Design a protein with these regions (language model features):
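Conserved active-site regions of diverse hydrolases
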Residues: 2-368
C-alpha cells in the first residue's frame, strides 16, 4: 500500500508539472498584480542597492545569473530565475515584478498596479535577523512599511474603492523564516518559545498586510534547512542518515503545523482572507526520495553547483568552477536551490494537491 501511495504521488506530481508548463506557455494574467515579500529565496535585486550589505548578502556578481536570459547577475540568489519568477510566470507575468529599490519615484507609480518585489536576502521575521551575517537588510517590518507607502500612492492615483478592489484580487507571495531559523539553531535556547515567536511575528505581518488591503496570500513554509550544503558541514554526530543536520530539520518540520494552525485561525478571524500554504518540507523531501522521474533528473542532491570545498559550501563567485549541468543539481550555492528546483516548487505551489499545498493551490486562490 505504501508503494502504491508513493507511486500515485509521483504520477500526480509529474502530471501537475506538465499541466503547469502548458499553462505557462499560453496563459493570460490570472490576477492584476503580484507583490512579493521575504528573503533571498525571492529577492530579485533589492540588496544590490543597500550600501551596508556585505558580499554574503548580495548576488550581483558572477556566477550568479549564468542561466538568466541575459546571462548576467541580477541580484537573484540563483543561476537563473527564482521561485517568485516562476510563480509569476504561471500567473501570466514575464517574471517577478521588479525590486522596489530599482524603481524611481516615477517608475514606482507606473509599476505599482502591476506588482513590486520587496524581498531582501538575509532578512527574516525578526527585525535584527541577518544583520550579523550580511549587514544591512530590509526587514519584514520595513518591507511592509514600504508597501504601505505604495498603497498611499495607489489611493492618490486611483481612489480608495478602485485600490481596495485591485489589492483584494492581487496575490501576495511570501517566503521567509529560514534565516531566523539558521541563526537560532546555533543557540537552541528554547525551541518552543522560538517557534511560537516566529509564528506570532508571521501573524503580525499578515494582519498588517490585510489591513493595507491584501486578501489573497501565497505562503511558503520553511524547507528542510539542515540538508543545505552549508549545514552539512556541521557536527557529524548530529547528522542524520541522509547526511543532513537533523536538529535544524527538526525545527523546520515542527514549524509547519504551527504555521498552518495560525493561518487557519487567521482566515476565520479576518473576513475575506484566503491563503495557500505550500509545504516546502514535504516538497523537498519528496524530491530527495524521488530524485529521478519522467520530468526531472537530479543526480546531485548534496553539493552546490557553484562553490568550492566540501559540498561546494564556500564562495560562489566568478573564480570557482561551475558544475557541468545545473539542471541535475538540487542546490545552486550553499543555501539556495537551482533554477530547476525553483521551477518545480512554483509549479507545485500553482497546481499541487493537498499533499503539498493547503487548503487550496495558487491557481485556485487566483480564481477565487
Amino acid at each position: 500500500m505504501a508503494n502504491q501511495t508513493a507511486s500515485y504521488v509521483v504520477v500526480a506530481l509529474c502530471l501537475l508539472v506538465l499541466v503547469a508548463e502548458h499553462a505557462e506557455a499560453r496563459q493570460p494574467r490570472l490576477v492584476p498584480a503580484i507583490f512579493v515579500f521575504g528573503d533571498s529565496t525571492v529577492d530579485v535585486g533589492n540588496n544590490n542597492f543597500l550600501g551596508g550589505t556585505r558580499k554574503e548578502g548580495r548576488a550581483n556578481f558572477p556566477q550568479y545569473g549564468v542561466d538568466f536570459p541575459t546571462s548576467k547577475p541580477t541580484g537573484r540568489f540563483s543561476n537563473g530565475f527564482n521561485t517568485a519568477d516562476r510563480l509569476a510566470q504561471l500567473l501570466g507575468f514575464p517574471m517577478s515584478p521588479p525590486a522596489y529599490l530599482s524603481l524611481t519615484r516615477r517608475t514606482i507609480r507606473s509599476q505599482m498596479f502591476k506588482g513590486i518585489n520587496f524581498a531582501s536576502g538575509g532578512s527574516g521575521l525578526g527585525d535584527h535577523t541577518g544583520r550579523l551575517v550580511v549587514g544591512e537588510v530590509i526587514s519584514m517590518t520595513l518591507q511592509v512599511e514600504t508597501f504601505a507607502t505604495v498603497v498611499e500612492h495607489m489611493y492618490q492615483s486611483a481612489g480608495s474603492k478602485r485600490t481596495a478592489s485591485f489589492l483584494s484580487r492581487s496575490i501576495f507571495f511570501i517566503s521567509t523564516g529560514s534565516n531566523d531559523m539558521f541563526e537560532y539553531s546555533f543557540s537552541r535556547s528554547n525551541d518552543r518559545k522560538f517557534l511560537a515567536g516566529l509564528v506570532a511575528s508571521y501573524k503580525y505581518y499578515l494582519k498588517a498586510l490585510y489591513h493595507l488591503g491584501a486578501r489573497k496570500f501565497s505562503i511558503v513554509s520553511i524547507p528542510p534547512l539542515g540538508c543545505t550544503p552549508s549545514q552539512r558541514l556541521r557536527r557529524l554526530e548530529q547528522m542524520g542518515t541522509q547526511g543532513c543536520f537533523d536538529p535544524l530539520n527538526d525545527l523546520s518540520l515542527e514549524s509547519y503545523p504551527l504555521l498552518a494552525a495560525m493561518l487557519e485561525e487567521l482566515a476565520h478571524e479576518l473576513p475575506g482572507m484566503a491563503y495557500s500554504l505550500g509545504d516546502a518540507y514535504t516538497m523537498v523531501s519528496f524530491v530527495f526520495a524521488n530524485p529521478q522521474t519522467n520530468d526531472w533528473s537530479f543526480t546531485e542532491l548534496e553539493a552546490a553547483c557553484c562553490g568550492e570545498g566540501p559540498f561546494g559550501a564556500s564562495g560562489c563567485n566568478q573564480t570557482v568552477p561551475l558544475c557541468g549541468n545545473r539542471d541535475n543539481h538540487l542546490f545552486w550555492d550553499a543555501n539556495h536551490p537551482t533554477q530547476a528546483v525553483s521551477g518545480i516548487a512554483a509549479q507545485t505551489l500553482f497546481v499541487g494537491n493537498q499533499t503539498f499545498v493547503n487548503p487550496i493551490n495558487v491557481l485556485q486562490l487566483a480564481n477565487m
